[in-house]
């Protein structure tokens, strides 16, 4: 007698995960030839089991999710170690199946038992899974799916720390400049989360890795890619103005080279670049303890800067904060003396 193929009642979470693991093992052994019938069937079975797993987690039109079954499913997923296999073979799945992988992964990450987050603990013990997700940005067909899972993971500080302090973190400086707009944007979103979500951890990272980080970051603010340049300038302003990054800000705004770069960006032909550069430039000028090299540059260019700023974005008549800041900068620069 043939078993029913569908129906939540027909399979337990243990059945679903066992079938999923068996299918993934076939792909593991024979996956180099995805046109081989046994691999095709295994990929189909993977998609089918993932859809059932998703039904356990999210429920269906007819049934609400059952917490006991969700807990059982999660435990079976951990015990069977199917998450690394799903991510390893993600590029072989159809679009809907990839989405289901991300849905299941992200939901499991959000699960808590009291103060514990079992999936966070599971991933923390297997950092290679996080690195595989990060390197997913190198493959256009899975980049966005991997990005969504990685962003969900780095919401948890312990997992974010693993990624941030990994040697592979530096790859973000390449990914955010991808020629593929969607990949570059997605990678920057993940990069920004890594640098801003966990304030104390990020401040510590920037303090300990200042030269390396900003040596690479300067390539982003000078990128030929408009979106990369604008996003990186905006993030730079946010990082420098965050009180947690006070020591990093002090170091950054005492560099004459940084000031020269920002002054050049103020004159960029694109208005949005000018505007973001303004919000970095103002930190240099507002610093009450400007070192002599910074004061010298501002003083040497005093008249030109006053003239430039007086005419700068005068159409922003409704932006009261911007106009107040601009007036303050003009006053500060006018008061500089040789």
UniProtKB/Swiss-Prot annotation:
One GO term (biological process): intracellular signal transduction
Domain of life: Eukaryota
UniProt KW Cytoplasm keyword: yes
Compartment(s) of residence: Cytoplasm, Cytoskeleton, Spindle pole
Entry keyword Cytoplasm: yes
InterPro entries named in the record: ARM-like, ARM-type_fold, Mo25
Disruption outcome: RNAi-mediated knockdown results in the production of additional AVM/PVM neuronal precursors.
Keywords of this entry: Cytoplasm, Cytoskeleton
Cited Gene3D superfamilies: Leucine-rich Repeat Variant (1.25.10.10)
Position of the signal peptide: none
A GO molecular function held by the record: protein serine/threonine kinase activator activity
GO CC terms, sorted: cytoplasm; spindle pole
Record function comment: Regulates asymmetric cell division in Q.p neuroblast lineage. Plays a role in cell shedding during embryogenesis.
Family: Belongs to the Mo25 family.
Protein name according to UniProt: MO25-like protein 2
């Amino acid at each position: 007698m043939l078993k029913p193929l569908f129906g939540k009642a027909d399979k337990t979470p243990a059945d679903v995960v066992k079938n999923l693991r068996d299918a993934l093992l076939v792909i593991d052994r024979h996956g180099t030839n995805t046109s081989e019938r046994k691999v095709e069937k295994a990929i189909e079975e993977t998609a089918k089991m993932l859809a059932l797993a998703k039904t356990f987690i999210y429920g269906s039109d007819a049934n609400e999710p059952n917490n006991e079954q969700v807990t059982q499913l999660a435990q079976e997923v951990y015990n069977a170690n199917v998450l690394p296999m799903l991510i390893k073979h993600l590029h072989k799945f159809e679009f809907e199946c990839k989405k289901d992988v991300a849905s299941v992964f992200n939901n499991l990450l959000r699960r808590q038992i009291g103060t514990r987050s079992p999936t966070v603990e599971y991933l923390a013990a297997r950092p290679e899974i996080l690195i595989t997700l990060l390197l997913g940005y190198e493959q256009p067909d899975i980049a966005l799916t991997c990005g969504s899972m990685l962003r969900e993971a780095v919401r948890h500080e312990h997992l974010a720390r693993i990624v941030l302090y990994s040697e592979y973190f530096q790859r973000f400086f390449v990914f955010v400049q991808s020629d593929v707009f969607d990949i570059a944007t997605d990678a920057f979103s993940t990069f920004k989360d890594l640098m801003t979500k966990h304030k104390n951890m990020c401040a510590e990272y920037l303090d300990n890795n200042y030269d390396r980080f900003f040596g690479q970051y300067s390539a982003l603010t000078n990128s030929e890619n408009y979106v990369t340049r604008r996003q990186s300038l905006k993030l730079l302003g946010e990082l420098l103005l965050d009180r947690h990054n006070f020591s990093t800000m002090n170091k950054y705004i005492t560099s004459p080279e940084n000031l020269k770069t920002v002054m050049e960006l103020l004159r960029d032909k694109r208005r949005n670049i000018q505007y973001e550069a303004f919000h970095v430039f103002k930190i240099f000028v507002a610093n009450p303890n400007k070192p002599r090299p910074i004061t010298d540059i501002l003083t040497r260019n005093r008249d030109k800067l006053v003239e430039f700023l007086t005419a700068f974005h005068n159409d922003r008549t409704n932006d009261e904060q911007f106009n107040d800041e601009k007036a303050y900068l003009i006053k500060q620069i006018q008061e500089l003396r040789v």
